[in-house]
């Protein structure tokens, strides 16, 4: 157990000198209404070990810290996967994330889990959306490959994607959400104008969207009025709405009704 830009980190056990997956907790209350697992991005292939300071790992730190400040009983953990890449049929990130989910379920049995993943982490979240206790899949500029599984009934999927993403094209998220909606699933796509794959352009908006989606999706579990925020305010396409009003309205619509929305 070691400090890792969070409260503490738990490491998976692997034989020999193999890299270890680790779980860093940014919020670990004795009791939680909801548990959030934050998943970083990666590459198609690569056996370089992810380090605490790796850029793909560090990029998710602001999201985890913001989620840890959400009012209510929330637990937040960041997974650092062993390898940089997906690595073909081995699908290394899936093995690591299943281990992490076991740790979350052991600490908080029966509590709903939200998977928040960027790029490759978004792909992991979509793959594991049907894992026990997972209730929300929140993909940020997700990498989606042909034939990837989709979360099933009882899961809510919200994808957020920048329209300037040249790494993981926006159309992948659009196709996925269209497919889920056609199957009667709870799904939404929030398109972020003038933003890139790394979520550095309009970074503050990305962080706000992530925290608000989690708050609205788990309003009952968090014990607040998050589910009512903005409900009676301007709609998502109201030109008179302030930027804050529009974000609130878009999140409300995405979580409660689904569809394709723009910011």
Regions found by a protein language model. Name each.
Residues 4-71:
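Short, surface-exposed "cap/lid" segments of acyl-processing enzymes
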Residues 51, 169-179:
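Short alpha-helix in the alpha/beta-hydrolase fold that links the catalytic acid
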Residues 87-107:
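Alpha/beta-hydrolase active-site loop
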Residues 116-121, 125:
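Gly/Ala-rich beta-loop-alpha elbow adjacent to hydrolase catalytic centers
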Residues 139-146:
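Active-site nucleophile loop of the alpha/beta-hydrolase fold
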Residues 153, 158-165:
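Short beta-strand/loop motif that positions the catalytic acidic residue
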Residues 186-263:
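C-terminal catalytic histidine-bearing segment of alpha/beta-hydrolase fold enzymes
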